[in-house]
Structures are given as structure tokens and as C-alpha cells.
Amino acid sequence: MSTNSRQILVTCALPYANGPIHLGHMLEHIQADIWVRFQRMRGNEIYFVCADDAHGTPIMLKADQMGVKPEQLIADVQQKHMADFNGFNISFDNYHSTHSDENRELVEAIYHKLTQNGFIKTRTISQLFDPEKAMFLPDRFVKGTCPKCKAEDQYGDNCEVCSATYSPIELISPRSTVSGATPVLKESEHFFFDLPAFGAMLTEWIRSGSLQQEVANKMQEWFEAGLQQWDISRDAPYFGFKIPNTDNKYFYVWLDAPIGYMASFKNLCGKKSGIDFDSFWSKESHAELYHFIGKDIMYFHSLFWPAMLDGASLRKPNNIFVHGYVTVNGEKMSKSRGTFIQAATYLKYLDPECLRYYYAAKLGSRIDDLDLNLDDFVQRVNTDLVNKLVNLASRNASFIQKRFDGKLANKLDDKMLFDEFIAQSELIADYYENREFGKAIREIMALTDKANKYVDEKAPWVIAKDESRTDELQQVCSMGIELFRVLIGYLKPVLPNLAARAEAFLNTQLTWENVASPLLDHQIAPFKPLFSRLDMKKIEEMIEASKIENAKANQTAGKSAVENKAFSEFEPIEESITIDDFCKVDLRVAKVLKCEAVPESNKLLKFILDIGNETRQVFSGIKAAYGKPEDLEGRFVIMVANLAPRKMKFGMSEGMILSAGNGGADLYLLDVDAGAKAGQRVK
């Protein structure tokens, strides 16, 4: 094992301070925490920091809706976020806020450095302005059609379908999400970061080989499309940091948010002696810096952030570790189905170690979505952790306690088997290092099977009946406990609570290095239950609780929108129609026979539908919302059956499938209750 201690700084993306943590957030934080805990076990000097992203118009407007100041809102949300992360054993060394003195100082220092180096430009721009609310509209408060791929209902800064970035004025048919009004153009002087000046540096960074291949490929696409100067300013009213020497200009939240990584670390340096800020962030730093993020914010972290750091003469990250989204039972998390589960709700019903283990068992180093299949969740946790792992300890501990007063044997019964377990240490370590947690879990569980096979073949319950085999009984049961100890050591980064209980039982502390040292002639503590079975009834209760909580949240949001009329995600109701108008639309239940992605399109899925007496081919722009189209096969949808066929580039579309949502990844197919049949008319 390596004896050279590495200096490492790890961050997670900053949760936005206007809403709760959910199980989608937890994927990233669990992934990072496992990696951090592994590095600590290896003896490396590692710091793990995060913060709340606490600026921007959404926070300003939500605070206004609630009748509180933004500072009060973000303080309350931060306490809830920290409680959720603590509940899931996320071992941050520091959790801070972007609305802090450290962040303000760093933001202004980096801005001044970029200005001195000639990377900040100013020019007057035409900006969208809400005539009803008398305010300039931030990017995320304008929606319209993407100018690149023509996907509808996209935000004003980037497209969730094709990942393109653009100016809000480039949107086709824009509308204000604050009032629903059509915005008008109004001039304003803005500040820009000269991103194109860093093209050569970013190209070299892509080719370094350190980035995930999917990230490098996507960056290459963005380069080919051309880098644009980045607007880093926003007009008042805005909740954030004011740009120095201006009256009503503020830093865009995406400028100060990643600097929040630095601010949280600087705050830690002020609280804990012996940590040097510059040794981690200076241009000459030899420390390692890694960001764990979701694929939805890849653009900002892979282009703007390294360019900002380079322009301010600071070091760049060694790597950006990008993960996919969480789905539940093969579908997007749904508030109506109760699968949009808040972290706090989960903690009321289930052990956080169960989710940590399940996520780890399915996580790899690629940017693949992870499906939380609830049936598989129960089976895997109960089989692996209860039936195999914990049972290995319990079936041997009782003999050691009753017959030998808790004393382990003074030699190994099967040294070859023990050596085989230790020999896997570096392979498992390599899997952890490279974030191939699923592969690590598979290796560990394969060893668990071998350990149980050893106990089954030795049959200590048979040996115990023969008084002449007392020494053999002690050695066999001690061997079983030794193998359990090694396995728990390997799983400690994933299951810190279980590991702590096991350490108390084993009367020892587990490090990666001492896993190889057997506990010979060692006193252990009386065995206590280490882990409880996962109960599907508890999951069902959690789902029902989530439905109720989400419904209440929607009612509160709806009431606030009506009372304050400050902000609404929903489109205004269209003009009234007559019943005769509605009856012209023939809505039918359709069964999905086949569904596949259209390779040449960024947003289309191709459906073959059974509508009772015939089949139809329909193209639907929901690709971003349903990443595994084959999973839709066999389910029922609602379609407009009498819509005139439309000839498209990829074939004839013979109808329209109905879905709800804001567009892009935020779309949900309409369901029908059990019993409905293909071809039935919707009335």
C-alpha cells in the first residue's frame, strides 16, 4: 500500500437554497462521501467541503412570497440541508454559504484580477424586460423555444434538450415566467467574461486525458459550435453581491457559486489550524482538486470555471467527476406518484445505510443514470447485508461468546483463505479510487459468499456437539469472524454506521492498512444486532408520505402565487372554448408497442401505438425526459387520434401523445388507471 500521503480537496455541487434536499441530490453526495472516506482510510490528507448556493432571483422572489428577508430564508434552508446531510452520514469537513464574507472577498478579488488581465469587457446590450413587473428578466425567468434545436419551453440561458447556451433574446417566442407577459427589449450596460480567450487552454485541458470521455466529447461539441463571451452581470433588483464601482449591477449567481467552493475551504482554514489555503488554490499548488457534479451543470464547470481560475492566475481542478440522474422504478422521480422523495422523508422511515449501499452497488465512473428500483432495493439490501454479511458474524459470535468468553483463537484456521481475502485489497482499492463502486461491491460480495461457504462446509454447529473438538470450534468461528472483519473493512467507506457498530463488536478500529492484520488471541465484545432488514411496508409508507408532502407543497406554492402574484411556473389559461370545440378532439387510450430514440434528433422518440383497431406511428419530443425509451413499451398513454398526419424528416407522424410539464427534461406522460384498453375514447 502507498505510504505517500496525498493532499486532496473535494467538493460537491452547491444545493440551491430555496428548496429541500431529495434523493437525486443524495446520489452525488453519497458518491463523493464514499470516495472521501476511502481516501481517509488510506491515510491521505483530504478535505471535503460544500455550501448552499444562496443567491439569485428565485431566492429573492420566494422570500418575498413568504414575507421574509432573503437572508432569513437561506439561513433556514441551510439548517435543513445540513440536517439532511448529517442524517445520511455525509462527512463534510465544512458546510458554508455563498452569502458569506469569504465568498464576497474572493469574488471581488477574482473579478479584479480578471479585469486587470483584460478578461472583463463591458458593452450595452438589449435585454428582455417585463413591462408588467418593471424588471429586467434573469435568464431562468424567461422561457421560449430553443434557437438551436427548436425544443419548446426552454429557459433563457441554456437548453435542457441539446445543452446549448445562448442569450435570452435569442429565444423564439419568449415569455416572462414572472407575469406571463411578453417581454420587451430594453438597453442596459453589462459585464462580460472573455471566454473565447481561453480556447487554447481549454482545448489542452480536454486533451489531457483526465476528464471522463463523455465530458471531453461534449466539450468538443461546444468548441465546434464556438465559444461566446459570458454575461456575468445582472440588473437590480437582485439578491447577490454588487459589482464594485456600480450602482445597480450584481454578479450573476453562476459567477459566485463555484467560487463558493473556495469560500467554504477558506472558512475551514480559519476554523482549523494547519491548513494553508494557498497550498490548495495557488497556481503552483501540488494538491489535488476534484469536483463531483451532476451532468446538468457540466457546461459551467468544464468551461467557465476552469477559464475563470486560469484568468485569475489560480489552479484548475484535476478533474470533474460527473454523474447522471436518479430515476425511480425506471421513471423520472414523480411528485404525484410519491417517488420524488425528500431526504428528510426518507430518514423518517428507512436506514440511510440502505440507500448508501444500493447507490454504491450501482455506481460506476460513467455518466449513466441510476435507477432506484424499489423491489430490487429491498432484495439487494436484505440479501447482501442481512442474510450474507451480518449473518456471517452472528452465526460465529454466539459460539465464541458462550464457549470461549469472547476470546478469539491464537491462530488462523485457514491462512490460505485469509490471504486470498487480503490479496483482493488493492483491486478493491483501485475500484474505489476510480469510482467504480459497483465493481468494488461485487468483489466484496463474492468474498462474502466464499466466507459463508467456508462456515457452511466447516459446520461449527456440528463441531460444537463434540467436546473433543473444542479447539477446532474456536478456530473455525474465529476464522469466520476474521473474514467478517476484513469484509467490513472493505465496506467501511460505504457503510460507516455499520462499520462503527462492527468495530465496537470486534473491539478494534479498522483502517485499510490494518485489515491485513488478524485479531489473534483477541477479546471481542458480546454480539448485538448490527443491521435490520428492509421492510417493503416501510417503503410504501414513505411513498404515501411523499405524496401527501408534495401535495401540500403544491398547495402552498399555488396559494403563494395567487396571494403574491410574484412568480408562477405555469402558463396562463388559454381563452375559453365551447363544448363543441372540445368534442372535435378525439382522445384515445393507446398502448405503446415499441418505442425507440430517433438518432438524428436531439428530442424525438418514435412510438408504434396500438389504438384498438389499428396501429399508428407517432413522433414525440420527450427524449430528454425519458432516457430509456424501451422502458415505455407496454404502458398506456393518451393520444390525439384525429390530428392530421404530419410528414416529418424522419417519417410520418400520425397523431400526438399527451404529456404535461415545462418541456425538455420536465415532461410527464399522462397515465390511465388499470382496466383501460387500447382504443377506448377519453371522455
UniProtKB/Swiss-Prot annotation:
Cofactor(s), names only, from the UniProt record: Zn(2+)
Database matches in Pfam families: Anticodon_3, tRNA-synt_1g, tRNA_bind
Catalytic activity as recorded in UniProt: tRNA(Met) + L-methionine + ATP = L-methionyl-tRNA(Met) + AMP + diphosphate
List of residues binding Zn(2+): C146, C149, C159, C162
Family per record: Belongs to the class-I aminoacyl-tRNA synthetase family. MetG type 1 subfamily.
Protein's UniProt keywords contain Ligase: yes
One GO MF term: tRNA binding
Protein's name in the database: Methionine--tRNA ligase
Disulfide-bonded cysteines: none
InterPro entries: aa-tRNA-synth_I_CS, Anticodon_Met, Met-tRNA-synth_bsu_C, Met-tRNA_ligase_1, Met-tRNA_synth, Methionyl/Leucyl_tRNA_Synth, MetRS_core, MetRS_Zn
Motif ('HIGH' region): 15-25
Residues binding ATP: K335
Subcellular location: Cytoplasm
Classification via NCBIfam families: metG (TIGR00398), metG_C_term (TIGR00399), PRK00133.1 (NF001100)
tRNA-binding domain residues: 581-683
Taxonomic superkingdom: Bacteria
One GO cellular component, as annotated: cytosol
Organism whose genome encodes this protein: Histophilus somni (strain 2336) (Haemophilus somnus)
Motif window: 'KMSKS' region: 332-336
EC number: 6.1.1.10
Enzyme class: ligase
Subunit structure: Homodimer.
Record keywords, A-Z: Aminoacyl-tRNA synthetase, ATP-binding, Cytoplasm, Ligase, Metal-binding, Nucleotide-binding, Protein biosynthesis, RNA-binding, tRNA-binding, Zinc
